[in-house]
Design a protein with these regions (language model features):
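Active-site region of glycoside hydrolase catalytic domains
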Residues: 1-176, 185, 189-199, 203-275
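Composition- and surface-driven signal marking solvent-exposed, interaction-prone regions
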Residues: 178-180
Length: 275
C-alpha cells in the first residue's frame, strides 16, 4: 500500500495527441482527418486501464490532463460561424465525457472513473477559429473574446464537479515571471470562488528542446535554463522567475489557509477525496 492515494494519468492530453496523430500526422499513428477515430481508440484503452486500476486498488485516483482552451469566432461573425466555433470549443471535453460515460457509453466509462480534473494551459490556448489568430493574454486592450483562466476553470468545474489541478503551464522567454504572476492571480480567483484547487505544475521545470528541433531550438521556459556551451547537465536559474514564484507561493499559501474546501472533496456525495 501507499501512505497517500496513488494518482494515475493513463494517457496525457488525449485531445491534443488525437489531433496531432489523427488529424495532422504529427505523431503515431500519422493519420489525417481521423482525429475522432484516434481519440476513440485512446479512450477505449484509457477506460480499460482505469477499470483495471480501480479493481486492483479502490484507493487509486484518476487525474485527467487535458488542454484547456477557448475557441471563438471572429468579430461580427455569422450565426453559422458562431455555432461552428462553439462546437469546436466543446470538443475539448469529449475525452473526459467518454471517461464519465456521458458519450460513447459502449466504452464503459463511469462518473466514478473521474477523480481529479487536470488541465494544461499555455499562453496560446485561446484563439479565433477562422481566420486563425491567437488571443493575447497580456495585451494592453484585451480582445473582447479573451477569457480569464479562472473563468475557464470555473466552466470545467461546473461541468464535472471535481477538484481541479493546473497540470501544465509555463511561458517561453522574458515573460516567464509575468506569466507566473498571471497564473497565480488566477489561482487566487479560483480559490475565492471556493473551487477545490489542488495544485499547479510548472512544465518544464528545467528547460527542454523543441520536440521537432532537438539540437537547435530550446524554449527557455523553465525555472532553470541550459547553456549549450556548458553542456546538457548545466542548470542556470532564471532568477526573475524564481523571485516571482517565491512571492506568488506565499500569496497562494495564505489564500489556501483561509479556504475551507482544499484538502477534501465530497465525490458524488458518497466519499471524500483527500490530498
Amino acid at each position: 500500500g501507499y501512505d497517500e492515494p496513488l494518482i494515475v494519468t493513463p494517457v496525457n492530453e488525449v485531445s491534443f495527441m488525437s489531433w496531432l496523430g489523427g488529424d495532422v500526422a504529427g505523431t503515431s499513428p500519422y493519420c489525417r482527418n481521423n482525429g475522432w477515430e484516434v481519440k476513440y481508440g485512446y479512450m477505449k484503452a484509457y477506460i480499460a486501464g482505469v477499470k483495471a486500476l480501480k479493481e486492483a486498488d479502490a484507493g487509486i485516483r484518476i487525474m485527467t490532463t487535458e488542454p484547456l482552451v477557448n475557441i471563438v469566432p471572429r468579430l461580427n461573425a455569422t450565426p453559422e460561424e458562431i455555432q461552428h466555433a462553439r462546437n469546436h470549443h466543446e470538443t475539448q471535453y469529449q475525452s473526459v465525457d467518454m471517461l464519465c460515460g456521458r458519450i460513447c457509453p459502449e466504452l464503459g466509462g463511469k462518473p466514478e472513473y473521474l477523480d481529479i480534473l487536470g488541465f494544461n494551459f499555455y499562453y496560446d490556448n485561446q484563439w479565433i477559429l477562422h481566420p486563425h489568430q491567437i488571443l493575447g493574454w497580456n495585451d494592453d486592450v484585451p480582445h473582447p473574446y479573451f477569457r480569464s483562466l479562472s473563468n475557464l476553470l470555473q466552466e470545467a468545474h461546473d461541468r464535472y464537479n471535481r477538484p481541479v489541478v493546473l497540470s501544465e503551464t509555463s511561458h517561453p522567454g522574458v515573460d516567464r515571471p509575468l506569466w507566473i504572476e498571471y497564473i497565480s492571480s488566477q489561482a487566487l480567483e479560483v480559490l475565492d470562488k471556493d473551487i477545490p484547487f489542488w495544485g499547479i505544475c510548472i512544465y518544464p521545470i528545467i528547460d527542454r528542446p523543441d520536440w521537432d528541433h532537438l539540437h537547435h531550438q530550446w524554449h527557455n521556459s523553465g525555472l532553470w535554463d541550459m547553456d549549450p556551451a556548458l553542456g546538457l547537465n548545466s542548470r542556470i536559474l532564471h532568477e526573475p522567475s524564481a523571485e516571482a514564484l517565491l512571492k506568488c507561493q506565499k500569496l497562494i499559501a495564505a489564500a489556501i489557509e483561509q479556504s475551507g474546501n482544499q484538502t477534501e472533496f465530497d465525490l458524488l456525495g458518497t466519499e471524500a477525496l483527500a490530498i
